[in-house]
Amino acid sequence: MKAVLFDMDGTLVDSEKLWEVALHVLYSRLGGELTPAIREATVGGSAESLMQMVYTDLGLDLDPDEMAAHSEWLHDYTADLFDGGLPWCDGARELLDTLADAAVPMALVTNTRRALTERALDSIGRHYFTASVCGDEVVSPKPAPDPYQRAAELLGFTPAQCLAIEDSVTGAASAEDAGCPVLVVPNDVEVPGSARRRHVGSLAGVGIAELQRIYSQLQPGLRS
């Protein structure tokens, strides 16, 4: 294991609840009501896929300009919520500190747009990360492998040399398809298992030795 690639929303910080608040308000503005099924389907998705899902769910015309305007509103509203402070997921900050103290390279890999990610980094601490990749900076965001491929490249490693930490179906698929072994932490939506994934109850108490062990189990034959 040469580096660790972190998802942001729901993995490091419990920002998914703030996204849910913003989505409820957006649905009200559009004359509808957010259902649990739609909320579950949007977790980990890109801005574009989210708006398509919302408009399709409400039976609205897929007008690109109107969708873009509502997407901007949603991100601005969420940014204001982010500015109120982002609660840490269990064990996340401690793991970042441990990895930073050991000089393990880290990258942030998120489907969130750059502008909103920068607001989040004000709360999380940008000093932890050598690089960050956002959903609006790649040709295809998660679940495509592009974000994780790009993050590994920026760190100077192959995806197989990096352990990805994710909480969503789309994020785990993105990391796995890029070639990363994946450590999955729980969120509201269950992530299916696979031969290249390991699940933990939370990041609380997880240290470098545990990450190395998981990495070795998921990458047989590779030196960690």
Predicted segments, located by residue:
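Active-site neighborhood of HAD-like aspartate-dependent phosphohydrolases
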Residues: 1-40
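Asp-based, Mg2+/Mn2+-dependent phosphohydrolase catalytic module
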Residues: 1-2, 97-100, 113-224
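Conserved phosphate-coupling serine/threonine residues in phosphotransfer and NTP-handling enzymes
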Residues: 11, 110-112
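An amphipathic alpha-helix signature
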Residues: 20, 24, 47-52, 71, ...
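Helix-loop "lid/cap" segments that line or gate small-molecule binding pockets
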Residues: 24-27, 48-62, 120, 152
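Short helix-capping segments at alpha-helix termini
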Residues: 29-33, 58-62, 102, 124-128, ...
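Metal-dependent phosphoesterase signature
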Residues: 33, 55-94
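Catalytic-core regions built around general acid/base machinery
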Residues: 91-104
